[in-house]
Amino acid sequence: KSDVRRMGIGVRHAGDDGASAYRIPGLVTTNNGTLLGVYDIRYNSSVDLQEMVDIGVSRSTDKGQTWEPMRVAMTFGETGGLPHAQNGVGDPSILVDEKTNTIWIVAAWTHGMGNGRAWWNSMPGMSADSTAQLMLVKSEDDGKTWSQPINITPQVKDPSWYFLLQGPGRGITMKDGTLVFPIQFIDSTRIPNAGIMYSKDRGTTWHLHNLARTNTTEAQVAEIEPGVLMLNMRDNRGGSRAVATTRDLGKTWYEHPSSRSALQEPVCMASLIHVDAKDNITGKDLLIFSNPNTTKGRNHITIKVSTDGGMTWPLSNQVTLDEDESWGYSCLSMIDKETVGIFYESSVAHMTFQAVKLTDLVK
């Protein structure tokens, strides 16, 4: 209901810690119940890479009511004799290995490229001098400290691709323990395509098979039943989300019946999570989705719930959080069995956190 006013918490604002802007939220809940919000620290301006950008993390141990001082999880400083603004790293995606509580962040590091946009200036090849690098960091202490970056570009990038990067937001641990991050790549014909990458050995080695759909970019992944992954994609065709499923970790993909019809979008990042019936108060298997619920502009940030595997998203199962214009990116994570958290780019703070009761969402 639009007449309900919900309290949000501004976690990051323009100017905090001397940074011009904060963008690209990711959110996870660790095995200990800690909330970790991740984002770009865009020091000089709000523009995308290449720029002076690091990966920041905000941590909450009280279900999002208060947040610890920002930590820098990934930075490349003056690597290779180039200034910090020529070593930006951005668009983070974060996951919790639910078997070990190791937390992984994947981000794209760009080296050189002047001040051109990486989307157009990353080139085919494998080296940092030619193409963006896919970098991981991990935390073994619930998000307090982070490892040195690990370069997995050689494991997963095709040399003919112009740009390989993650799908910003979050990844998942599958029921069988497989770690999965959404990815996107600009292929040799300069068409972007969404997909996934996965690890079967707790994050040491990563694999990437086939694209889910052409001309798609930022995606989020959910395990809708054991071994079955759903990828919900930003589609450059506009108007509506693309949705595909795979049973073999991305070797083969099938268009979902809801694709390009059930969820409207203005061509923007969105969030999707699956919650098992046993893990939430409703006793139903839930898919929870958030995005700007519009086809024009980025406004009306809305959380929607489907109880039929993503086929329908009834109006009764929707809550609008922010009607005004913003950058519009969001990420969802369950806080406890009764509550979903959302970390999003709002009209009032660059990184806003809100907690919404499932009883308000599932009627």
Predicted feature descriptions by range:
Residues K1-K363:
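Asp-box/BNR beta-propeller blade signature and adjacent active/binding-site loops
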